[in-house]
Amino acid sequence: MLVAVVKELKQGEGRVACTPENVRKLTDAGHKVIVEKNAGIGSGFSNDMYEKEGAKIVTHEQAWEADLVIKVKEPHESEYQYFKKNQIIWGFLHLASSKEIVEKMQEVGVTAISGETIIKNGKAELLAPMSAIAGQRSAIMGAYYSEAQHGGQGTLVTGVHENVDIPGSTYVIFGGGVAATNAANVALGLNAKVIIIELNDDRIKYLEDMYAEKDVTVVKSTPENLAEQIKKADVFISTILIPGAKPPKLVTREMVKSMKKGSVLIDIAIDQGGTIETIRPTTISDPVYEEEGVIHYGVPNQPGAVPRTSTMALAQGNIDYILEICDKGLEQAIKDNEALSTGVNIYQGQVTNQGLATSHDLDYKEILNVIE
């Protein structure tokens, strides 16, 4: 199987889907690997480093001729022309956010494996490290955009406690998963107060125990509680994600209107559509806009801003799956590995993820029934 590592075209995206170390694992296993020129530069990996591990450096067009194309994010519109029948595209594809790309993949007969929908032992194994990074960075961005020079309230999130007692900011975090706890931990490290809004009762108990000695309040998620707590936020971070599907718009425009003027609103799951009615995707180079008097931060690829760290994390997580596909062939790998099967969103043009099918009102078939 010919494996290609392509350079990301998304604005501000410095990650690469495969490190030189992982290229060596593939070539040692007898697989041919091609790497697009400068694909790893943003993460600190030169072309020479890949060549030393057995890869061949190629052009963008040549990379897309591969049987298995390894990416970080969804293909850019300009790359749709390279899709070919039975080609496998691997990455954090977030297909629920774009019906256009899904229809193009269906038309050509592409197989799409989305890392964010791979579930192992009930957890989003590959997404978790990226969620952790996005959560931590969101807390930092909330502090940054709280400053007056960026349009914020002009508050120092840490407060001041030398001979005076000026309280720090309040972070309201919607959701209680990996991204949420990582955001909360950074906010606490900044001496901020944290309110977490979570739906699941078992998770609420877990969070209450986890933060028993910290300045954290855990609130049951209801529309009424959300509307009340969001008014307290200096920084509001939504972390709600439904793997493979578009989340509902739970944070309404009226709720945003009720927030403090100059407060900061961040939606970590914007790459899947987001849960905030007033949010729209932005870029790392132009990350914010103001609406209803609130600073909106809608960057869909936050880990791309710290590519060295993010690349190491995602490459460590995905290599075993990629090796299994290359060693066994996709169909046998799917049969042998239940977690991998959950990542197959489209198989040779057929939608095989229920959430994706529902999001775009498309026909769904269970993956094991399709490959038999």
From Swiss-Prot:
CDD domains: L-AlaDH (cd05305). Signal peptide: none annotated. The keyword NAD applies. The keyword ATP-binding does not apply. One of its GO terms (cellular component) is plasma membrane. One of its GO terms (molecular function) is alanine dehydrogenase activity. SMART domains: AlaDh_PNT_C (SM01002), AlaDh_PNT_N (SM01003). SUPFAM superfamilies: Formate/glycerate dehydrogenase catalytic domain-like, NAD(P)-binding Rossmann-fold domains. Gene3D superfamilies: NAD(P)-binding Rossmann-like Domain. It comes from the Bacteria. InterPro entries: Ala_DH, Ala_DH/PNT_CS2, AlaDH/PNT_CS1, AlaDH/PNT_N, AlaDH/PNT_NAD(H)-bd, NAD(P)-bd_dom_sf. NAD(+) binds at residues 170-200. Belongs to the AlaDH/PNT family. This is Alanine dehydrogenase 1. It comes from Staphylococcus aureus (strain MRSA252). The gene is ald1.
